[in-house]
Every structure is written in structure tokens, then in C-alpha cells.
């Protein structure tokens, strides 16, 4: 099953923990904010990144 990953860029503080934990799913943009790269089937990695986000800017939903 694929998962849609979203980052609320208004909430994101650019901590980059998500990109460090799950580089296949997140990248840091030129704006200093995290952006999802692709939908993912690696729910464990995406959930770990979402839980690690200090401001709760990451959401996951079934694609």
C-alpha cells in the first residue's frame, strides 16, 4: 500500500530530522523546509519521521 506524505510548510521549522531519518521520502527545499519527494510504501520510515518532527508538520494518509 502506498502512503501520501504531506508537510505543512507553514509549520515546518526546517529541523531536517525527517530528511535524515527517511531520505528516500523527504528532501530539504531551497526554502529551508522539508518536502516529500514521493509517495512511499515504507510506512515505518515515514511514521518515524512524522513522530520525530518537533512541530508535528508531517501527516500521512493512504494514497
From Swiss-Prot:
A molecular function GO annotation: electron transfer activity
Keywords: 3Fe-4S, 4Fe-4S, Disulfide bond, Electron transport, Iron, Iron-sulfur, Metal-binding, Repeat, Transport
Annotated protein name in UniProt: Ferredoxin
Signal peptide per UniProt: none
Obligatory cofactor(s): [4Fe-4S] cluster; [3Fe-4S] cluster
Encoding gene (name): fdxA
Cofactor binding annotation: Binds 1 [4Fe-4S] cluster which readily converts to a stable [3Fe-4S] form.
SUPFAM superfamilies per the UniProt record, alphabetical: 4Fe-4S ferredoxins (SSF54862)
Any Pfam family hit: Fer4_13
The protein's role, per its UniProt record: Ferredoxins are iron-sulfur proteins that transfer electrons in a wide variety of metabolic reactions.
Binding sites annotated in the UniProt record for [4Fe-4S] cluster: 12, 15, 18, 53
Domain 4Fe-4S ferredoxin-type residue range list: 3-31
SS bond list: 22-45
Amino acid at each position: 500500500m502506498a502512503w501520501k506524505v504531506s508537510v505543512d510548510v507553514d509549520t515546518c521549522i526546517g529541523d531536517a530530522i525527517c530528511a535524515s531519518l527517511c531520505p528516500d521520502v523527504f528532501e530539504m527545499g531551497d526554502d529551508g523546509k522539508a518536502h516529500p519527494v514521493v509517495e512511499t510504501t515504507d510506512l515505518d520510515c515515514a511514521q518515524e519521521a512524522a513522530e520525530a518532527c518537533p512541530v508535528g508538520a508531517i501527516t500521512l494518509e493512504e494514497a
